[in-house]
Amino acid sequence: MLRHAIETNVQIFTKFLVISASAVGIGYARKLFDQRPQRDDSFLSNSMIKAYLETRQYPDSFALYRDLRKETCFAPDNFTFTTLTKSCSLSMCVYQGLQLHSQIWRFGFCADMYVSTGVVDMYAKFGKMGCARNAFDEMPHRSEVSWTALISGYIRCGELDLASKLFDQMPHVKDVVIYNAMMDGFVKSGDMTSARRLFDEMTHKTVITWTTMIHGYCNIKDIDAARKLFDAMPERNLVSWNTMIGGYCQNKQPQEGIRLFQEMQATTSLDPDDVTILSVLPAISDTGALSLGEWCHCFVQRKKLDKKVKVCTAILDMYSKCGEIEKAKRIFDEMPEKQVASWNAMIHGYALNGNARAALDLFVTMMIEEKPDEITMLAVITACNHGGLVEEGRKWFHVMREMGLNAKIEHYGCMVDLLGRAGSLKEAEDLITNMPFEPNGIILSSFLSACGQYKDIERAERILKKAVELEPQNDGNYVLLRNLYAADKRWDDFGMVKNVMRKNQAKKEVGCSLIEINYIVSEFISGDTTHPHRRSIHLVLGDLLMHMNEEKYNW
């Protein structure tokens, strides 16, 4: 009886077909569809076309439409065309989209608001904004979705002025979707003033709204504004936490990133995902919080996230930066799949841990399996620098061009440091003079340090002028030259440098140290009088000093 109902009633058959497509598979649904003697029913045919769309088999939705037009009396309706325009948008089939638009004209559906909105959205997704605007202008009636489709297209293409103008012209009450889209456009362009104006205008804000603004403030390095919004959020999801944690790491505040990660675990029931782990691991690496890094590694294994290449790469990078190079190597060897970033992290790990030869050997192996990039070559030159391998460093620096890679300022800086450490000061200075970039403060400070090491006052004087222009308040540059003058008993010049330091208000960067105990990272700053436990710290330090004196420890 049920079988008879399915076979004779097209409504029941269509519902059975849709259930079969999702529960059994699209192939089985198509087999049922093809066995049907009458396939030109619009409800049935549209359902089969939509089933292809929902299973992301976009070419098959077009193929079925063409077959139905050739083999049956199927007459497409507005539902057919809205489904097919969406299929075009998602598959980015421009040629199919153009053909479809001509079919829409042919069957007289251009005046249909839903079909025309689909056409506008399709062209906007293709980046063909001229076609999208023409279709929009020809619409006799437009919905809020029509306006949103065109505005979103302009935003994606970076035409924010046109998007903003349309946004202001919208006759409808704007909903949160279009506000979020417009705000996201401003955020991506770095225009946080306009983004904030929209944010303050909104009467209803979603988690996406708040998170978009937080992400924007993190991008422009206004981490305090980002945190104020984060703290003011009425509701947070995992994406919000990930954005704020990542923002701290991105803005060189790793301890705050770790604290927030621990706060998330202590105050919410949210489980970290791969994005959380990828956000917090750089902070762990920067602070040397190895115990927390090991916890992350165990968590990744427990949640089966270690199948993801990016996560494994971040874990091995963390271990290598925390000095656990053997653990890093074990993870690298066990990775079922490696990307260029994985090789780069392992080579750089060897370089950081002073194993230059292992880094270069791995690089040679990498060249058999992967094509090195600029980051690879920086890791290789860094390894040569740490290992004092001047000739190999020169070789790989010059080979970069033959490999089709352009040396960036970081590569030049590493070479200057390598040559300076080796005492090749003339070659290093020539490299600074002839490099296709203006040298930055790091390069000049590195070279000044080499001049100090090899007592080359003349070169130090030349370079200091450039260094002072770039970083007038960096006391380290002055101190190097001042010490050289003192060693040479040039007391007038020594005094002159001191006066320049005073005039430029050069200050010594305050030293700090970090220690991790029970997953908590504590920071100690030289001369800090604001630490909440300073009395206890000073008492313990006093006891330690007394003990060292009693043991006649030579410190």
Swiss-Prot record:
Family: Belongs to the PPR family. PCMP-E subfamily.
A GO MF label: RNA binding
PPR repeat residue numbers: 41-75, 77-111, 112-142, 143-173, 175-205, 206-240, 241-267, 273-307, 308-342, 343-370, 373-407, 408-438
Annotated region (Type E(+) motif), positions in chain: 519-549
InterPro entries: E_motif (IPR046848), Pentatricopeptide_rpt (IPR002885), PPR_At4g14850-like_plant (IPR046960), TPR-like_helical_dom_sf (IPR011990)
Record-linked Pfam families: E_motif, PPR, PPR_1, PPR_2
KW Repeat (keyword) present: yes
Gene Ontology BP annotations: RNA modification
Signal sequence segment: none
Keywords (A to Z) from UniProt: Repeat
The name this protein goes by in its record: Pentatricopeptide repeat-containing protein At2g44880
Record field: transmembrane: none
Chain positions covered by the region annotation Type E motif: 443-518
Organism (species): Arabidopsis thaliana (Mouse-ear cress)
